Amino acid sequence: MAGNTIGQLFRVTTFGESHGLALGCIVDGVPPGIPLTEADLQHDLDRRRPGTSRYTTQRREPDQVKILSGVFDGVTTGTSIGLLIENTDQRSQDYSAIKDVFRPGHADYTYEQKYGLRDYRGGGRSSARETAMRVAAGAIAKKYLAEKFGIEIRGCLTQMGDIPLEIKDWRQVELNPFFCPDADKLDALDELMRALKKEGDSIGAKVTVMASGVPAGLGEPVFDRLDADIAHALMSINAVKGVEIGEGFNVVALRGSQNRDEITAQGFQSNHAGGILGGISSGQHIVAHMALKPTSSITVPGRTINRMGEEVEMITKGRHDPCVGIRAVPIAEAMLAIVLMDHLLRHRAQNADVKTEIPRW
């Protein structure tokens, strides 16, 4: 199975299944001498961890990460960092009824078409449980970017269903279970989630992720443009069906005179481009949005087929998120951090000696 690695100089390879013994990853390219402990990674893992509120899956995994290699006396050695998280709360019996049935909207059908078999327990490798290791690896990147370059990465929920959320106060994001920056909408979100749980249904969401302090110059035209790699990374997250950079699809309704980010002696006057021009960072905030579909793991009966091609009706059992967009926030932050870390190392490798007289803001 290919496709388990992302990055060139900062490389992350993950392994493991939803109901396997453990999840793990190998992180290559981390510079030596960086102070690193398991506690540095645990904060973001706790933000993503299931079973932390009544709005998410009640699968209760502690998600305690173990550093197996690449760290000595509390600092990175420059060698491969091995990370492991044990699975402790599997209920594989919840999935015995779907052994020979393809859940509509899931990867069951496509995995079996591709590999000729599938791990039906919680989706196996296709489960979003895999993203725990992305968050652990991303925490390493976030720490390096913040401490060495002052780059801050943060994300939030900006829409759930038909409820738009304004980024009014970033401090609110960590104070509620929705990662919501708009305190005025918390009651509406709560009401929607209660209704969904009662109906046994789910809802889609929009997540925004932003990086500030990113220097100008990151990105490798033409095929490894920074925005292309960010889109690739975010699209690789489970349930993501669309990615926008900056204004995204809103540019369709704009004129060139409105969309261009004019420049004065004081700097850029707008950021419709989302901090990336020609595939290279401009020094402005990098802004990306992603749309997540409503999960198909619901108790509303639906039509499907079994392995013999017979039509059957099914209800998905197990413990699932009514809105997967909530826990996607720390995952999006991690993927953006991984891409920026990789591009920063690549930029330094080729262009460390480049000096320009062009203003930077």
UniProtKB/Swiss-Prot annotation:
Cofactor(s) for this protein?
FMNH2
- What biological-process terms (Gene Ontology) are attached? amino acid biosynthetic process; aromatic amino acid family biosynthetic process; chorismate biosynthetic process
What Enzyme Commission number(s) does the record list for this chain? 4.2.3.5
Question: What's one Pfam family the UniProt record gives for this protein?
Answer: Chorismate_synt
Report which reactions are catalysed by this protein: 5-O-(1-carboxyvinyl)-3-phosphoshikimate = chorismate + phosphate
Example GO molecular function: chorismate synthase activity
Any one GO CC term of the record: cytosol
The residues that hold NADP(+) are 48, 54
Q: Where does FMN bind?
A: 125-127, 238-239, 278, 293-297, 319
- Write out the pathway annotation from the protein's UniProt entry: Metabolic intermediate biosynthesis; chorismate biosynthesis; chorismate from D-erythrose 4-phosphate and phosphoenolpyruvate: step 7/7
Query: What PROSITE patterns does the database record attribute to this sequence?
Result: CHORISMATE_SYNTHASE_1, CHORISMATE_SYNTHASE_2, CHORISMATE_SYNTHASE_3
Q: What does the UniProt keyword field contain?
A: Amino-acid biosynthesis, Aromatic amino acid biosynthesis, FAD, Flavoprotein, FMN, Lyase, NADP
Cofactor info, note text: Reduced FMN (FMNH(2)).
Which superkingdom heads the taxonomic lineage of this protein's source?
Bacteria
Q: What does this protein do?
A: This reaction introduces a second double bond into the aromatic ring system.
Q: Which family does it belong to?
A: Belongs to the chorismate synthase family.
Q: Whom does it interact with, and what assembly results?
A: Homotetramer.
Q: What is this protein called?
A: Chorismate synthase
Q: Species name for this entry? A: Salmonella schwarzengrund (strain CVM19633)
